[in-house]
């Protein structure tokens, strides 16, 4: 919600969402559409965007569709202008684009690493650079960055993805510092664990093996609901999922251990996984089947709860074990 004159708050009804054609972006568009108002939806796949927009219109929202690539700064600036003209103002901008490639760093071409950084970091910076002047002119606004668990700990087999998310985390922290003189402009970060979206189906794959997401896996609608809550009550950071909280706790104490555990787990999985073709995925072109919210990776609720518990206990036990095994520093050393 945005503060108006007199100190009261008005609902966020003018929303911009990038990466809105599937997954978390689509779920968030539909969640905001249920509240009415005006939505501006952007992504590379115009056809998939139109399908999402039609669903949102049926829910009662007015919708503008803008096909673009967030790595194109000029296109993003035009998106911001079009959104302001369509809505009259911009209450919340959800910077949601994310791509990636899975594989050992040296096995993935540098052009793929560069593309990942351009989309996941420069793309979000383009979003902020375009909308923050509008926020400052209207003296309010909420900018939401989709980061992920990858912004809290190193990600073996996804080095560029992890670098982009660490960079995005630092970028958000810097923006928050710069916005302190604007009390009604908020920079919010969302850190979900693994989410059941089509993203992994569309990722670049340089492992030669089939990809899957480790449990527990979040419903994209849960992440969307969290973004909607930020519209009502902005906060700096929002962590979602047991693995995220576990890593947030453990990483400051044992960053190297966490990375080694992750590398070992991925290595064991790929050693026995089914073979799959090497592909660049959707990094340079949108996939033909890019629509849909769900990726089809989730397990039944009982198994999800067990997996969540196992993840939390496993990380905590690893950190405790490391603490017991680490040699204590002696006085004077």
Residue ranges of each PLM-predicted region?
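SDR active-site lid
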Residues: 180-274
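Conserved glycine-rich cofactor-binding loop
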Residues: 21-22
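The beta1-alpha1 cofactor-binding region of Rossmann-like NAD(H)/NADP(H)-dependent oxidoreductases
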Residues: 46, 68-78, 110
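Conserved glycine-rich Rossmann-like NAD(P)H-binding loop of the short-chain dehydrogenase/reductase
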Residues: 37-52
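Active-site helix of classical SDR
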Residues: 128, 164
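Substrate-binding pocket helix/loop in short-chain dehydrogenase/reductase
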Residues: 104-105, 112-117, 316
């Amino acid at each position: 919600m945005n503060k108006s004159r007199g100190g009261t708050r008005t609902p966020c009804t003018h929303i911009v969402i990038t990466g809105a054609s599937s997954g978390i972006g689509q779920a968030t568009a539909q969640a905001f559409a249920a509240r009415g108002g005006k939505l501006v939806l952007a992504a590379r796949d115009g056809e998939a965007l139109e399908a999402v927009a039609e669903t949102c219109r049926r829910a009662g929202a007015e919708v503008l569709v803008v096909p673009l690539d967030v790595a194109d700064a000029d296109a993003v600036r035009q998106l911001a202008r079009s959104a302001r003209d369509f809505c009259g103002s911009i209450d919340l901008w959800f910077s949601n684009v994310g791509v990636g490639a899975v594989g050992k760093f040296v096995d993935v071409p540098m052009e793929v690493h560069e593309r990942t950084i351009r989309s996941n970091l420069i793309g979000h910076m383009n979003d902020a650079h375009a909308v923050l002047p509008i926020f400052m002119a209207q003296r309010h606004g909420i900018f939401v960055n989709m980061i992920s668990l990858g912004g809290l700990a190193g990600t073996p087999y996804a080095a560029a993805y992890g670098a982009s998310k660490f960079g995005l985390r630092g970028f958000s922290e810097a923006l928050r510092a710069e916005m302190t003189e604007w009390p009604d402009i908020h920079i919010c970060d969302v850190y979900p664990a693994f989410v059941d979206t089509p993203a992994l189906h569309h990722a670049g794959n340089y492992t030669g093996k089939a990809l899957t997401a480790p449990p527990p896996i979040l419903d994209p609608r849960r992440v969307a609901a969290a973004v909607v809550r930020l519209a009502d009550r902005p906060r700096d950071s929002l962590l979602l999922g047991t693995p995220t909280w576990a890593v947030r706790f453990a990483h400051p104490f044992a960053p190297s251990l966490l990375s080694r555990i992750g590398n070992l787990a991925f290595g064991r999985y790929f050693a026995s996984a089914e073979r799959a073709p090497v592909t660049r995925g959707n990094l340079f072109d949108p996939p033909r089947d890019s629509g849909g919210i769900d990726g089809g990776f989730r397990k039944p609720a009982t198994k999800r709860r067990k997996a969540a518990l196992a993840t939390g206990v496993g990380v905590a036990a690893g950190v405790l074990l490391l603490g017991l095994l680490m040699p204590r520093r002696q006085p004077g050393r």
